[in-house]
Amino acid sequence: AHTPAGLERVLESLRSFTDGDLWCVFGCGGERDIGKRASMGVIAARLADHITLTDDNPRGEDPGAIVADIRSEIINHPDVWIEHDRARAIQQTVSRASNGDVVLVAGKGHEVWQWMAGERREFSDQAVARAALGGQA
């Protein structure tokens, strides 16, 4: 989900069959449409019980500024957590979730790299999530 509409669709879909809490781990890419960041935060706040904001592909942009943009219009949400290290964000969110909860890790999908500070680094959301679940994903 790289767009507000995409994030909204997937969260609405997951919400429809989630018995427990819905957790959302996401960030926005750097050097991309800055205008969508706040709206993605608002959508996550409306549809998810717990939000973890993290780095996606910040590229050459300041990751703190990206997260601040996302967070800027999230008002009175009871659980918004910021962890810039994406692997740690996924691991800790999975560990905080309970049986019956659903954790959405949005943004990178099939990508097996992350652009940070102008460097392409090997990284897989899927591999990190599987490891966090003890290989059960």
Predicted feature residues:
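ATP-dependent carboxylate-amine ligase
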Residues: 1-137
